[in-house]
Amino acid sequence: MPHRCWNESYAAGDLPWDTGEPEPLLVEFVNADRVRPTRTLEIGVGTGTNALWLAERGFDVLGLDVAPLAVEQAKKKLNGRDLRCRFAALDFLAATPPDGPSHFVFDRGCFQVFDEPEERTHFAARVAAILAPGGLWLSLIGSTEGPPREVGPPRRSAREVTLALEPALEILELRGAEFRAHDTKAWFCLSRRREIPAQPSTRHE
């Protein structure tokens, strides 16, 4: 979807992805101490619900979105509270985030919107470039494992996910999950930046 269309969605209040509540899969991940408060980047921050929830728990968060109206709404939610949370209107694929390396990157339904394999590979490479050594990327991705449908947000197969990530990232966990607010299937994908390239298969002799 072009940047203009995202902005139009926020102008019209047509935001089916915005539940107004922090994503349960993220909440469970944080509450299980799988990531501790650290410098964090959220890509596709929307109106800031998840970013603010993280900041309330001690994370130092930068939230990015291509839609300036989304960022305006997120800043209104922040409303001068004493939190380490900032929002910026920025195209993550084209511009470098201003805060430097992040130890935790999060997106919910952003990676999945890119239809071309090259775009998804580029997205993953950009995440790898912004991750600090040992940093984690948690991506929640619409899954093709759900029932057939004619319309709705993009969905990706496990193969599409791994093909995009593996050149630049080591996949630590890829499992089926659900976007509970919409009762739809999802992938829970946790990865980290590669320190050595992925190796080709060896021949059995």
Which residue ranges define each predicted feature?
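A conserved beta-strand element that flanks and buttresses the S-adenosyl-L-methionine
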Residues: 106
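Short catalytic micro-motifs in class I SAM-dependent methyltransferases
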Residues: 109-113
